[in-house]
């Protein structure tokens, strides 16, 4: 084991020395040739700044510009709320203190912006109602073009309870933006919302019943994706809703689909009602039998069935333990208790000391009157009941009959919703500093993607440039999740442990102590080593003698001249021919039977 350790240490040390020695030799060879260049570089470094350190790429902000026709687009980079109208309404059925929509809005940069010059709409106050809206360039009509709504949200302080969704306000003669409130008719509501641990991404549209004219909200199914990160990571996220004329829809976050479906199949409640409904006037007949099982009417109670037998009986085999104190009560008055000074016997009655466990019973098996313990009665059967059998008159669970739905309609084009002419934010939030940016309403996917790349794309690039390296990210992650430190330690320690194990592992030699555990005689290790060394020395002397003899023979052969060498050369080919002939099968003698 010690030899393995020494070998590992020598290998590591030797490698280091060799590398250092090679580097030193190279430096000695080149030092005279490069001396002048080094002096010049030192002088240049004094006059020029050091640019060897890597610098993070700088992202320059430029306000996005729509590359095609849009119904609405605003990046807020002009620095004002121009075009937006603050609501002056009051919310119904709410205390006057919080009924007003008096929440503050401002246009400003993010608090920790990585893209100077990029401004957005900021919800500034908490625990207040906020409402702000803006007119579209022209109303959006649901015809042959898709509808694409997109905007950015950053929960700069996280989010405790509140929403960041937009409403597309329906085009109606009554629409008045300075009276925008929670009951203002809208066509679509879309965006993130959170309260407690319930994380939502709303897509709701109001569908008009063509028969009654009543509007009903239709909610998209919940996304399968985990939405929590979008609310907690304090990064800017891009929310996109795409509605197509074929009734399909897609919901994207950061340009990745998190939900999709069809307006006809994936909304709750469904757009179209059932063709048939249960008759509300139908009633179950009195003789309708819903019992799948009934008691057997032909069953008879057995004669030996005793319904009066108790479930428990005293154990007749039990005996009173020795030392049982029959005359001692289990509880006695506390001798140390005293009547309270404020005790009024007229009001509280006669005072009695509280009961405590009898100290004499602690050393005894029990006190008081001894009673036999109760055991299960083997003859107990309980009240007799006839066995259950299948009901021959079973008719199943009754349901009212189906009748045609008088309110049935079939709308195969729910995409053709109520036109809208404004976009608004009507929010309640317990968290301030919610940042909105780069709203766009359009019918061209290419234009929306260009707008996203020029706006949100720059934010993403700036965030990436400012992010720490891999080590920094690992440290940040471990600060949020301390158990990651264990993973890091194991990841580093495991390879080191394997290297040590490889270097130090070897076949374990038996020790003298182990030899003594067996009856077989064992040789003395030291004597064997001495004998091996003596044999090795003798072998070395013999090899030296043989080498000297061979050298002497060679010198004698050289003195004899070239005659012997020539004869030897002549004999070699002949000997080789004889050997080949002897190996040939034809020259072998037949074997006698």
From Swiss-Prot:
Instruction: Show the segment(s) annotated as P domain (Extended arm).
Output: 277-410
Positions modified as Phosphoserine? 555, 565, 584
Q: Does the keyword Chaperone apply?
A: yes
Interaction with PPIB: region residues: 327-360
Residues reported in the UniProt entry to bind an alpha-D-glucoside? 165, 167, 186, 193, 426
Q: Which residues lie on this side of the membrane: Lumenal?
A: 21-482
Q: Principal place where this protein is found?
A: endoplasmic reticulum
Outcome (variant: residue 348 to K): Abolishes interaction with PPIB
Query: What membrane topology was assigned to this protein in its record?
Result: Single-pass type I membrane protein
Q: Which residues carry this modification: Phosphothreonine?
A: 563
Where is the region Disordered? 261-346, 511-593
| Compartments reported by the entry | Endoplasmic reticulum membrane; Mitochondrion membrane; Melanosome membrane
Q: Where is the composition biased (Basic and acidic residues)?
A: 282-320
Describe the processing and modification events after translation.
Answer: Phosphorylated at Ser-565 by MAPK3/ERK1. Phosphorylation by MAPK3/ERK1 increases its association with ribosomes.
The identity of this protein, by name, is: Calnexin
């Amino acid at each position: 084991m010690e030899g393995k350790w020494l070998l590992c240490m020598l290998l590591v040390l030797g490698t280091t020395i060799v590398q250092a020695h090679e580097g030193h030799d190279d430096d000695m060879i080149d030092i005279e040739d490069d001396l002048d260049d080094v002096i010049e570089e030192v002088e240049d470094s004094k006059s020029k700044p050091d640019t060897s350190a890597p610098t993070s790429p700088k992202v320059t902000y430029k306000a996005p510009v729509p590359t095609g026709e849009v119904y609405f687009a605003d990046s807020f980079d002009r620095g004002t709320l121009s075009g937006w109208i603050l609501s002056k309404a009051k919310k119904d059925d709410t205390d006057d203190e919080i009924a007003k929509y008096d929440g503050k809005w401002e246009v400003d940069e993010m608090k920790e912006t990585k893209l100077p010059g990029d401004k957005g709409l900021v919800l500034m106050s908490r625990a207040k109602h906020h409402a702000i809206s803006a007119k579209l360039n022209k109303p959006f009509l649901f015809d042959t073009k898709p509808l694409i709504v997109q905007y950015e949200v950053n929960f700069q302080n996280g989010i405790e309870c509140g929403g960041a969704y937009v409403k597309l306000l329906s085009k109606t003669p009554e629409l008045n933006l300075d009276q925008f409130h929670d009951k203002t008719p809208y066509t679509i509501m879309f965006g993130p919302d959170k309260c407690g641990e319930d994380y939502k991404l709303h897509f709701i549209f109001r569908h008009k019943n063509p028969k009654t004219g009543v509007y009903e909200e239709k909610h998209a199914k919940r996304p399968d994706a985990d939405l929590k990160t979008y609310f907690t990571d304090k990064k800017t996220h891009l929310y996109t809703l795409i509605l197509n004329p074929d009734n399909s829809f897609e919901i994207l976050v950061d340009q990745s689909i998190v939900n999709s479906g069809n307006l006809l199949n994936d909304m709750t409640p469904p757009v179209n009602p059932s063709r048939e409904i249960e008759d509300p006037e139908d009633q179950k007949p009195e003789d309708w039998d819903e019992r799948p099982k009934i008691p057997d009417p032909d069953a008879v109670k057995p004669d030996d069935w005793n319904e009066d037998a108790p479930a428990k009986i005293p154990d007749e085999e039990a005996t009173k333990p020795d030392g049982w104190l029959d005359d001692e009560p289990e509880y006695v008055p506390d001798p140390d208790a005293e009547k309270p000074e404020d005790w009024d016997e007229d009001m509280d009655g006669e005072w009695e000391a509280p009961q405590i466990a009898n100290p004499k019973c602690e050393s005894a098996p029990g006190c008081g009157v001894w009673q036999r313990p109760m055991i299960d009665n083997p003859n107990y059967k309980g009240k007799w009941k006839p066995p259950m059998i299948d009901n021959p008159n079973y008719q199943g669970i009754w349901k009212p009959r189906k009748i045609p739905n008088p309110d049935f309609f079939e709308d195969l084009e729910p995409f053709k919703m109520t036109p809208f002419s404004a976009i608004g934010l009507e929010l309640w939030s317990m968290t301030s500093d919610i940042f909105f940016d780069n709203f766009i309403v359009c019918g061209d996917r290419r234009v929306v993607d260009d707008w996203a790349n020029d706006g949100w794309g720059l934010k993403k690039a700036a965030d990436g440039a400012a992010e720490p390296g891999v080590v920094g990210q690992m440290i940040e992650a471990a600060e949020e999740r301390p158990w990651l430190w264990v993973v890091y330690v194991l990841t580093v320690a495991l390879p080191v442990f394997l290297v040590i194990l490889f270097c130090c592992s070897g076949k374990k030699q038996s020790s003298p102590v182990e030899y003594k555990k067996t009856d077989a005689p064992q040789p003395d290790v030291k004597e064997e080593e001495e004998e091996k060394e003596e044999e090795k020395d003798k072998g070395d002397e013999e090899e030296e003698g043989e080498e000297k003899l061979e050298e002497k023979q060679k010198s004698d052969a050289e003195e004899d001249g070239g005659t012997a060498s020539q004869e030897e050369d002549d004999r070699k080919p002949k000997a080789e021919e004889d050997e080949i002939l002897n190996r040939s099968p034809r020259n072998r003698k037949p074997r006698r039977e």
